[in-house]
UniProtKB/Swiss-Prot annotation:
Alphabetical list of InterPro entries matching this protein: Amidohydro-rel, DHOase, DHOase/Allantoinase_Hydrolase, Dihydroorotase_CS, Metal-dep_hydrolase_composite, Metal_Hydrolase
Record has Metal-binding as a keyword: yes
Protein name per its UniProtKB record: Dihydroorotase
Keywords for the protein's UniProt record, in alphabetical order: Hydrolase, Metal-binding, Pyrimidine biosynthesis, Zinc
NCBIfam families: pyrC_multi
Gene: pyrC
Enzyme kind, highest EC tier: hydrolase
Annotated residues for binding of substrate: H62, L63, R64, N94, N278, H309, F323, G324
Cofactor, how bound (note): Binds 2 Zn(2+) ions per subunit.
Single GO BP term: purine nucleobase catabolic process
Length: 432
């Protein structure tokens, strides 16, 4: 179907567009972006007062299927993506079975073909069964369609194994994504180390458990002239290490999550399992460092680390609750509030962080409204305030500390490959 989006404020950093434009969609592609377009054969979307941008790309999504369908499925997770304005998500490999072989990728790819509501890319596992001991077959995974490789959920802690992974990643030209955590330093911890963990009597996780591993990854990447992407950066020290490495020419990129630059460890005073995540919520100083790193380019992308868990896994004692929260549906309004409304960055910068930059890092032909590109478009009402209620949640799980919160910035329309899949905030998808 042909669509004509009229009167939108279009923001497309790739083409330096930031103003009122019309967008014509034809045959699943962007046909034109011009000051005024007329086409009587197209369905008109009047976007007056709304902001249109390339669809968001999430580098870090846990869709849980195959193997953990009680938490999330590819169908429900990609419904949440649509609701949050994400048109492409990258599913992490900590499924059951892990994404460590072409056969296991094929299982996920079959489900994606049948049930996904957005574009889904797959992260292969760096090591077999994500056990951190023996490398997966990188060439096989790349040929099978893996977009990058990670053992996310845990890090590859053996130095020799990670060094071998870097060497093979250079050989196969595939990006490694690091869950930077030294479990010897974080062992048994449940929240950030500091006054609040002491006051609450909860076992701490030090900043060093993250930044020491970030330091190692960068040293290995530098020595082997390899690329590395650091997932879910949460500490001031990590930001400083990454900034220094970039100045030295190391091919390092990094992401931060909205919860890590929105909340501090003070949120854990509620003892709610929905404030427990890995990396943990950090101090005010860490949050400020993340925001500055997003502003100055030290951190390249915003990712959700959407991590659904069932009620019985979260509504328990804090020590026993699983790590992780959902994030696809709240990422944009949180980032808009903390980064744009505060005056720290402008909308063009935010679109870069959520769409163009993740696309570039992963080598995807996304994140742009260039004519000929896939018509993946998100249209937002920046002024609309709404409550993130349990009834609103499209994910199979509701583990979010933002449930019940007033948010600003509402996704009105989401196009995926030229198909209108969210209209006036309502999903237009059939049940799987």
């Amino acid at each position: 179907m042909k669509y004509l989006i009229k009167n939108a404020h279009v923001i497309d950093p790739a083409n330096k567009i930031d103003g009122l434009k019309d967008i014509l969609i034809e045959n699943g592609k962007i046909a034109a972006v011009e000051n005024k377009i007329e086409d009587n054969a197209a369905k008109i979307i009047d976007a007056k007062g709304l902001t249109a941008m390339p669809g968001f790309v999430d580098m870090h999504t846990h869709l849980r299927e195959p193997g953990q369908e009680g938490k999330e499925t590819i169908f429900t997770g990609t419904k949440a993506a649509l609701k949050g304005g994400f048109t492409t998500v990258c599913m992490m490999p900590n499924t059951n079975p892990a994404m460590d072989s072409k056969n296991n990728l094929a299982i996920a790819q079959d489900i994606i073909r049948k049930t996904a509501n957005v574009n889904v890319e797959i992260m292969g596992a760096i090591t077999k069964n994500r056990a951190g001991k023996e490398l997966s077959n990188f060439a096989e995974l790349k040929q099978a369609g893996a977009i990058a490789l990670s053992d996310d959920g845990s890090g590859v802690e053996d130095d020799a194994v990670m060094q071998a992974a870097f060497k093979e990643s250079v050989k196969q030209d595939i990006l490694l994504i690091s869950h930077s955590e030294d479990s010897k330093l974080s062992a048994g911890g449940v929240m950030n180390e500091g006054l609040i963990s002491t006051k609450l009597g909860l076992k701490p996780i030090s900043n060093a458990s993250e930044y020491e591993m970030v330091k190692r990854e960068i040293q290995l990447a530098k020595g082997l002239d390899a690329k590395i992407h650091i997932a879910h950066v949460s500490t001031k020290e990590s930001c400083e290490i990454i900034a220094k490495a970039k100045k030295q020419g190391v091919m390092v990129t990094a992401e931060a999550t909205p919860h890590h630059f929105t909340l501090t460890d003070k949120a854990c005073e509620s003892f709610s399992g929905n404030t427990k995540m890995n990396p943990p919520l950090r101090s005010e100083a860490d949050v400020e460092a993340l925001k500055q790193a997003l502003k100055d380019g030290t951190i390249d992308a915003i990712a959700t680390d959407h991590a659904p868990h069932a009620v019985h896994e979260k509504e328990v004692e804090f020590d026993l609750a699983y790590f992780g929260i959902i994030g696809l549906e709240t990422a944009f309004p949180l980032a808009y509030d903390v980064l744009v409304k505060s005056g720290l960055i402008d909308m063009a910068k935010l679109v870069g962080l959520m769409s163009l930059n993740p696309s570039k890092i992963l080598g995807l032909k996304k994140g742009t409204l260039t004519p000929g590109a896939d018509a993946d478009i998100t249209i937002v009402d920046l002024n609309k305030q709404w409550v993130y209620s349990k009834e609103e949640v499209q994910s199979l799980s509701c583990n979010s500390p933002f449930i019940g919160k007033n948010l600003q910035g509402y996704i009105e329309y989401t196009f995926v490959g030229g198909e209108l899949k969210l209209e006036n905030g309502t999903l237009k998808v059939k049940d799987a």
